[in-house]
Amino acid sequence: MEELDITSVGQFQTLVRYNNPVLVVKHPDKKGGAPLTEIEMKRPQTAGALLDTKRETEEILNSILPPRCWEEDGQLWQQSVSSTPATRQDVINLQEMLDTRLQQTQARETGICPVRRELYSQCFDEIIRQVTINCSERGLLLLRIRDEIAMSMEAYETLYCSSVAFGMRKALQAHEEKEMLRDRVKTLELDKEALEEIIADMKLKQEQAERRNAELRASEEKKFTEEITFLKKTNAQLKAQLEGITAPKK
């Protein structure tokens, strides 16, 4: 079996078709003794050299989808994307596998869903792989589209994170301002109560002053009335005496 199923690639799960993993071994260089890294296949290699077009296609595929490396049991493994052309049945299987994975992972059908986005990205990568094998120019064009979409998504995520951070800062600022306004309202309410007490005290003093003034005015009016009455009486007596003195005797 030259290639793995698209559901079990090494220790990963992906919709992209990969070759069988190969073991990466290190051995000293014959000249300088420095360690060199090369790929040692676990299966016998096919006889003969690869065609230039196939080698070029594999290089393009490796540039689009770089080989994956991981370490297992102290050994380094590497896995490159498959260069086998896809059949119509492979495309149907890819669609079915995508739907199955979407259901298994319970990905959201609408809205923002990282799981759904990852699965569709894997599906798009597999489509790019299939197209690149048949036409490298078309595959590179799809690669540009994929990178543009990824760049746009990163920009949207950055903008979203910035908006969320800005909203949180504004909400925190509004909360702080709200607390400050509450403290200000409490202070103003205390000032209002103090002023109301002052006003009530001043009203009481005003009423007392008006009452004292009314009593004083009534007392003064009574005093003046008595003086006027006394003066009128005295004036009448003096007038009568004056008339008695100045009247001719008979």
Curated annotation (Swiss-Prot):
GO cellular component, one term: axoneme
Superkingdom assignment: Eukaryota
Alphabetical list of InterPro entries matching this protein: Axonemal_dynein_light_chain
Similarity comment: Belongs to the inner dynein arm light chain family.
Coiled-coil residue windows: 168-250
Subcellular location per the Swiss-Prot or TrEMBL entry: Cell projection, Cilium; Dynein axonemal particle
Keywords attached to this entry: Cell projection, Coiled coil, Cytoplasm, Dynein, Motor protein
A family per Pfam: Ax_dynein_light
GO biological process, one term: cilium movement
Main subcellular localisation: other
MF annotations from Gene Ontology: dynein heavy chain binding
Role summary: May play a dynamic role in flagellar motility.
Protein name: Putative inner dynein arm light chain, axonemal
